[in-house]
Each structure stands twice: as structure tokens, then as C-alpha cells.
Swiss-Prot record:
Name by which UniProt lists this protein: Origin recognition complex subunit 4
Domain of life: Eukaryota
GO MF annotation: an example: DNA replication origin binding
Function: Component of the origin recognition complex (ORC) that binds origins of replication. It has a role in both chromosomal replication and mating type transcriptional silencing. Binds to the ARS consensus sequence (ACS) of origins of replication.
Entry-linked Gene3D superfamilies: P-loop containing nucleotide triphosphate hydrolases
Stored InterPro entries: ORC4, ORC4_C, P-loop_NTPase
Organism: Saccharomyces cerevisiae (strain ATCC 204508 / S288c) (Baker's yeast)
Any one GO CC term of the record: DNA replication preinitiation complex
Sequence positions bearing Phosphoserine: S9
Length: 529
């Protein structure tokens, strides 16, 4: 090899990503299709079991008719309070504002939908519901969403043939925020539902104002230092509008009141409902009993299924009771337990296999094992060499930092230093002389390629998506709500923090990486400072 050829960068052989072949995908699809056909044949041969299975899945999915739904015991006090507030707004035409606080999947929106569905049967034309989500709507799109939903629901109440001429619904969302809310107030104040009631020879005309129910999911996203104009105008509607308005906000922030400005807080009713959680094992067992007990005689197997279920729940040594106890002592999450039971019911071919599955709970063991394989340790084993190198470099920087934080620039600088240290110990060029011709040649040993920073950015984003890194604002509690907002919102006063300067924290430390990474790995020596 000549000197000019030696100056060229060595060819890098990239390891291909292992993907499933088309044959494997087709084989898996064929197995699933065959299993589906077998299940359909079993349902056709035993229609009673098919009805029972569909009923159980409806109860687990929460898609039963409103009259047949069962509220869990630990949620009933909260449900009664929500029921009282909604009835005061819709029936007695009062205005209220409430915030529901609880973790995700704690049945906040479920209880609101349940109560509104019950009242929809008797007071269908006396209220409309407007739903907004902080993850979907910004302040401006929320105004457009309010206008669109008002138009659609008011036309349903008045009928598609009747036109509302007081305010142009097409231009309700145009103009400034103050003008928009003036149009909304004018529209709500002028919108009435007129009914003619015939009683013999006397015609009486009754006029009923329409209650507007706002449901805000993730209301805390509208409560930042620069995004509270929407909440201020809505809470001001509750105080001064002649039309009854009821606002329900759902959030996971325990200190939501600290997020509100003084002018917003002065118009808020200060009513906060904290969603109750399962406190003891009996509540968990009772919730599972309500989920799986069939209360209507839709199949000849119903009574036998209820007896089998009650026997398993009453026996403290049963496999089902063991899984309930394990969930209570670890996750304490009813949705997690429910998600593990759904495949058990859906894959049963007949009543005998369903009873056997609920007694053995072998499917629940497989499900839990599969979920645990999706933890950080399992994900770490799927990383490429470059991703692993960047992860270890970030962990080294985090261990040296006083607060355990790091950014992309610091992690890349550590990666660059470690790669150069390894390459410096590898002889790159070794001159040799050909005896016959007397010409000097060079043999080149392969060194580790140092990837450019622009190429590593994609790897960094993958590690963030895999939850190895978490933004510093999402870890721990802040001194106040304003500090939390500043930390989690990079766009403030027209400036934006660059991608490579955002602070992160590790979800797996360097000592844990040393225990997981095999000693044969080329980066194992990096796991120790």
C-alpha cells in the first residue's frame, strides 16, 4: 500500500440492524390468523360462551351502556361530589368551576363522562359539552375548538334546518381574545331552547337557558406565566355570564393552585377534588370483582362463571389472589392488572379454557414477564455500539457533575476524548520495506471511527425516546410553579434554548451499567472512572 493510499480513511463496516425477515412476519401472521379462525369456530359452536366473552371484554374495556356501568367502591364518594356539581349546573342553572387532581388513569375523565351520559338521557337539550386538551390545543387553537364545538352542538339542539342569526358562527373565532369571548357570551346569552307544551287547550311556552360544560384535560398546560389569558376569560365567564357555565379541569399537578395567577385565582372557586386511590387490598379485590362479575343473564354460563370467580377471589392462596396482592404491593395500579386480564379473556376458546386460565393465571405470569423485559436493562441490550458509547459517556459526565446533570455537548466531548484515548493506543501506520523492490509500504490497523457531532444527534434523540435520559425539568419537585414552567418550556420571551444545551439527567447510573454490560464488550473499561 502506498503512502497516498495510507492517508485515506479506513473503510468502516457498519453492522446491519437485525430485522425480521418476510418469512418470519408471514409465519407469525398465519399463526395469528389461524388462532382467530379457531376462536371464531368455537364461538359459533357455543354461542353462549361468545356472549359471555363479549360481555367480559365490554366490562374490561369500559364500553358497557351507561345504566349498566358499575363505579368502584373507593370512587363512589368522589362520584357523588361530581354528580352534585353537574346537577346544580345543568338542572338548577348554577355556575361552577372545579379542578380534579389525580395521577393518570385515575378515572377523572371516566367519571365526568359517566355523569354526563346519565344526564344526557333526561336533559339532552339543556346542556352542551366542550372538550379541550392541553396536549393538543394551544391558546389560539383552543379558541377555534370552542367556536367549532359550539357551532356543531348548538345546531344539533336547534336542528339542522334552523339557522342561528344572532351571531355569525363562522366568524366567532376571528379577532382578539377579548372580542372572541364577547362573541361567545353574546351567542350563549341569546341562545335559548323554546318548547311548546300542550296541556289540553292551554299552550305554555317555556324558555330554558343552555348550560355550557367545559372539560379541560391537562389544564396545567394553560396555566403558565404567558398562557393564562384563556383561563382568565373562562373563569370570568363563570362569575359574570348570565348563561350557566361549568368548568372541569383535569390535571396531575398536586400544586395546581400555585400555577394560577392572582387574577385567575380570584375568579376560581377554589374547589379542588383529589381523586381517591386504592388504600387497602380489600379495595383492590373488590374492584377486580366488579370488573369480572357478570350481572345480567346473557348466557347459561353466567352463574357458573360468577361462582368460579368468587371462589378464586375468596381463596387467599389462589393464583388470581396472588397476582392481585403482587400488584397491590408493587404498582398498585388497577389499569395494569386489567390490561393483563384482557388477553386472558380474549384468547380463551371455550368456557372450560377460560375457567382453567383464570385458575392457573399462567397468562398473567407471561404478561408480567413480558412487561418486565421492556425495562431499561432489556432496552440496554438492544443498543448499537455507538448508542452504548454515547450512553456511557453521558453517565461518566453525570457522575462527575455536582447535580448529576449533563447536556449533549458535554457528553459528546467525553465520547470524543475516550475514542481518541483508545485510538492513541492502536498503532495506525507500521512501515515495512519490500526486499525485492526496495519500496516502502504501510499496513494500517483498523481504529474506532469518531463520528461527527451532527451524526450523533440522531443517536441522542433515540436514547431520549428510550427513556435513558430525562429532561431535568421532569425530575423532582420545583420550588414553585413558575420555576417548573421556566424549566420545562424553552420558548420564553422570544428566545429558545438550543438542542445541545438542554439539561438532562440519567435514569441508569454508571455503576449499574458496569453490572449489565458484559466484560467482553469493548466499552466495558469506560464504565469505571
Amino acid at each position: 500500500m502506498t503512502i497516498s493510499e495510507a492517508r485515506l480513511s479506513p473503510q468502516v463496516n457498519l453492522l446491519p440492524i437485525k430485522r425480521h425477515s418476510n418469512e418470519e412476519v408471514e409465519e407469525t401472521a398465519a399463526i395469528l390468523k389461524k388462532r382467530t379462525i379457531d376462536n371464531e369456530k368455537c364461538k359459533d359452536s357455543d354461542p353462549g360462551f361468545g356472549s359471555l366473552q363479549r360481555r367480559l371484554l365490554q366490562q374490561l374495556y369500559g364500553t358497557l351502556p351507561t345504566d349498566e356501568k358499575i363505579i368502584f367502591t373507593y370512587l363512589q364518594d368522589c362520584q357523588q361530589e361530581i354528580d352534585r356539581i353537574i346537577k346544580q349546573s345543568i338542572i338548577q342553572k348554577e355556575s361552577h368551576s372545579v379542578i380534579l387532581v389525580g395521577p393518570r388513569q385515575s378515572y377523572k375523565t371516566y367519571l365526568l363522562d359517566y355523569e354526563l351520559s346519565l344526564l344526557q338521557q333526561s336533559y339532552k337539550e339543556q346542556f352542551i359539552t366542550i372538550r379541550l386538551n392541553g396536549f393538543i390545543h394551544s391558546e389560539q387553537t383552543a379558541i377555534n375548538g370552542i367556536a367549532t364545538q359550539l357551532e356543531q352542538q348548538l345546531q344539533k339542539i336547534h336542528g339542522s334546518e334552523e339557522k342561528i342569526d344572532d351571531t355569525s358562527l363562522e366568524t366567532i373565532s376571528s379577532g382578539s381574545l377579548t372580542e372572541v369571548f364577547e362573541k361567545i357570551l353574546l351567542l350563549l346569552d341569546s341562545t335559548t331552547k323554546t318548547r311548546n307544551e300542550d296541556s289540553g287547550e292551554v299552550d305554555r311556552e317555556s324558555i330554558t337557558k343552555i348550560t355550557v360544560v367545559f372539560i379541560f384535560d391537562e389544564i396545567d398546560t394553560f396555566a403558565g406565566p404567558v398562557r393564562q389569558t384563556l383561563l382568565y376569560n373562562l373563569f370570568d365567564m363563570v362569575e359574570h355570564s348570565r348563561v350557566p357555565v361549568c368548568i372541569f379541569g383535569c390535571t396531575t399537578k398536586l400544586n395546581i393552585l400555585e400555577y394560577l395567577e392572582k387574577r385567575v385565582k380570584s375568579r376560581f372557586s377554589q374547589r379542588v377534588i383529589y381523586m381517591p386511590q386504592i388504600q387497602n387490598l380489600d379495595d383492590m379485590v373488590d374492584a377486580v370483582r366488579n370488573l369480572l362479575t357478570v350481572r345480567s343473564e346473557i348466557s347459561p354460563w353466567v352463574s357458573q362463571w360468577n361462582e368460579t370467580l368468587e371462589k378464586e377471589l375468596s381463596d387467599p392462596r389462589s393464583n388470581l389472589n396472588r397476582h392481585i396482592r403482587m400488584n397491590f404491593e408493587t404498582f398498585r395500579s388497577l389499569p395494569t392488572l386489567k390490561n393483563s386480564i384482557i388477553p386472558l379473556v380474549a384468547t380463551s376458546k371455550n368456557f372450560g379454557s377460560l375457567c382453567t386460565a383464570i385458575k392457573s393465571c399462567s397468562f398473567l405470569d407471561i404478561y408480567n414477564k413480558n412487561q418486565l423485559s421492556n425495562n431499561l436493562t432489556g432496552r440496554l441490550q438492544s443498543l448499537s455500539d455507538l448508542e452504548l458509547a454515547i450512553l456511557i459517556s453521558a453517565a461518566r459526565v453525570a457522575l462527575r457533575a455536582k447535580d448529576g446533570s449533563f447536556n449533549f455537548n458535554l457528553a459528546y466531548a467525553e465520547y470524543e476524548k475516550m475514542i481518541k484515548a483508545i485510538n492513541s493506543r492502536i498503532p495506525t501506520v507500521a512501515p515495512t520495506t519490500n526486499v525485492g523492490t526496495g519500496q516502502s509500504t504501510f499496513s494500517i490497523d483498523n481504529t474506532i471511527k469518531l463520528w461527527l457531532k451532527k451524526d450523533v444527534k440522531n443517536v441522542w434523540e433515540n436514547l431520549v425516546q428510550l427513556d435513558f435520559f430525562t429532561e431535568k425539568s421532569a425530575v423532582g419537585l420545583r420550588d414553585n410553579a413558575t420555576a417548573a414552567f421556566y424549566a420545562s418550556n424553552y420558548q420564553f420571551q422570544g428566545t429558545m434554548i438550543p438542542f445541545d444545551l438542554r439539561s438532562y439527567q440519567m435514569q441508569i447510573i454508571l455503576q449499574e451499567l458496569r453490572r449489565i454490560i458484559p466484560k467482553s464488550n469493548m466499552y466495558y473499561s469506560w464504565t469505571q472512572l
